[in-house]
Amino acid sequence: MLWQGESIRKVTGGRRRPAQGKRRFEIGLAPADTHIGEDRSKLVRTTGGNTKIRSMRAQFANVTNLANGETKKVKIENVEENGANPNYVRRNLLTKGAIIRTEIGRARIMSRPGQDGIINAVLLA
């Protein structure tokens, strides 16, 4: 759990006296950290009683070839680059914008696996 409310400290270092305590809607969840492996997802309740599918592990990605508009379900081999964090490459974490190696070549992830529960990618030329 991660509290995302306003800080008690001001920029100057002084202390604010909050009018209220911490509220449930100010609390966020830990990141999903989607790894490469046998498909596993988790259903999470969100604001308004809606649900989100969090992909914990993923083995396949829907890769689209923009040249001919064809989409294929292909196996993910490993993570090659990740602009979000260099450590994610070592840990093989799948995030939006990560470049992955697949059976048909390199692809960039366009979806958010921790939010959407699915991996959509675009084939790189």
UniProtKB/Swiss-Prot annotation:
Q: Does the keyword Ribosomal protein apply?
A: yes
According to the UniProt entry, its GO molecular function terms are: structural constituent of ribosome
Q: Does the keyword Cell division apply?
A: no
Cystine connections: none
Q: Which CDD domains match?
A: Ribosomal_S8e
Q: What top-level branch of life does the organism fall under? A: Archaea
> Pfam families attached here?
Ribosomal_S8e (PF01201)
Please list the coiled coil stretches: none
Question: Region annotation Disordered: residue ranges?
Answer: 1-20
Matching entries from InterPro entries are given as: Ribosomal_eS8, Ribosomal_protein_eS8_arc, Ribosomal_Se8/biogenesis_NSA2
Q: GO annotations under biological process?
A: translation
Q: Name one GO cellular component term.
A: ribonucleoprotein complex
Q: Keyword set for this entry?
A: Ribonucleoprotein, Ribosomal protein
Assembly notes: Part of the 30S ribosomal subunit.
What PANTHER family does UniProt report for this protein, alphabetically? 40S RIBOSOMAL PROTEIN S8
The family this protein is said to belong to? Belongs to the eukaryotic ribosomal protein eS8 family.
What is the protein's given name?
Answer: Small ribosomal subunit protein eS8
Q: What is the lineage of its organism?
A: Archaea, Methanobacteriati, Methanobacteriota, Stenosarchaea group, Methanomicrobia
